[in-house]
Amino acid sequence: MNAKPDIQILTNFLAEYTTAMVSAGTYTARVEKCVDRIANHYGYDVSVTIFVKYFTISVMDSQDNSLRRTYVRKIPLGQVSFNRISELSSLSWQILDEGLSLDEAKESFEGVMSVSANKFASSLILISLANAAFCRLFGGDAGSVVCIFFATLVGYTLKFALAKMGVNLKVQYVLTSFVVSFIAYLGVSYGLTHTSDVAIGSSVLFMMPGVFLINSVFDILNDNTLVGISRAISTGILILCMAVGVYITLTPSSAELLNV
């Protein structure tokens, strides 16, 4: 049986763990269960309240209610990584099943965090291929598929660069959607494709914030209504930003490109 860890050290670890889970794209209930599992193993009670930009974590000694710590942390904007979510969730079970000490748990956590959330090169190629495949699925011709593949390559690279520069997420969506839709428009204007509506409509599909939307539904279903509604509104704003970028492309063209 491991010695009960110091509450300050444990709270620091749980705050870092929660930050990693939320920024990787986890819904609220899963974060709460994993953090609660770890805290209970070390003999502490924990309460986590998650919002869109911040979260609050309170850790209390289950045998001495006067011993407690409360942190408010900002949630950094990170890449969605299902692999990291899975690894962090597995770590919480490993701590419980194998009885890891807090030092061992911190070492395992650092090992998970040392691995890149997503490999840029492989993500770039796979996302570009997937977006081009969607274009073909929706009836795009060969020219549209090529245009969308190239547009996605450029758009994903641009979005990655803007994120590295710390540009506001909404601005990222406006600029990226404008660039990818404009590349698709160039394909139409130069006669590379004859399915203009599919080309321009498909160009921004890779930007859809699907994970955020799904998480908002899960949060509402799990009675985390406040954060669920907040995430849904934030997702709607991002979709609106995408529409603004496409609108900027279509406005100066003075042509009815979308046959709808």
What are these regions, as identified by a protein language model?
Residues 1-100:
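Soluble N-terminal domains of membrane-associated systems
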Residues 19, 23, 40-44, 93, ...:
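Generic secondary-structure signature for well-ordered alpha-helical cores
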Residues 188-260:
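Generic detector of multi-pass transmembrane helix bundles and their immediately adjacent loops
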Residues 73-76, 138-143, 194-199, 259-260:
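Interfacial loop-to-helix junctions that mark the boundaries of transmembrane helices
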Residues 77-131, 135-144, 234-243, 254:
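Alpha-helical transmembrane segments and their cytosolic membrane-interface
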Residues 108-112, 155-166, 214-226:
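C-terminal ends of transmembrane helices
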Residues 116-190:
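Core alpha-helical transmembrane segments of integral membrane proteins
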